């Protein structure tokens, strides 16, 4: 009886210390990727304009909306790239020198939605995430920051942006994902990275 209890304790503790299983339940990207790829002419145009991979943009569309341009989430994220007007939308407007934020009807327009979402990815990459050296790690950081905010990601490394970037550069891409899985306050963050990568692999 005592031996059985000790064995259970070892298994329990091992489970507590392991990385969360963010790859379950399984997710099949085939249908959402097929629907997202119909917008490739727009994603290629926006990607080239902002220096962002069109494949990454298409993968985010597949994961976020499954290619549905009129989708509105419970948190009021709108359209193909599920943009929140008051956060990402407002940030892009500010960057462009415009006042206010995009309307819901603007965000339901596929071309405008993709343009704003791609611009936001570029702002993240060349702004708060600037300095991340490994391209694969930068992609993962972009994906997490797009869905949960760059601040939440960087604070898992340090309250100081420069120190956080340095710590990120000390990790391999796989170690970065493991860090996110163990430390990010949003439990869906590592799964989001995985789903976007699955979508890119399915193209």
Swiss-Prot record:
It is a lipid-anchor. GO terms for molecular function: lytic endotransglycosylase activity. It catalyses: Endolytic cleavage of the (1->4)-beta-glycosidic linkage between N-acetylmuramic acid (MurNAc) and N-acetylglucosamine (GlcNAc) residues in peptidoglycan with concomitant formation of a 1,6-anhydrobond in the MurNAc residue. GO terms for cellular component: cell outer membrane. It comes from the Bacteria. Its main location: membrane. Its EC number is 4.2.2.n2. Belongs to the transglycosylase Slt family. Murein-degrading enzyme. May play a role in recycling of muropeptides during cell elongation and/or cell division. Preferentially cleaves at a distance of more than two disaccharide units from the ends of the glycan chain. This is Endo-type membrane-bound lytic murein transglycosylase A.
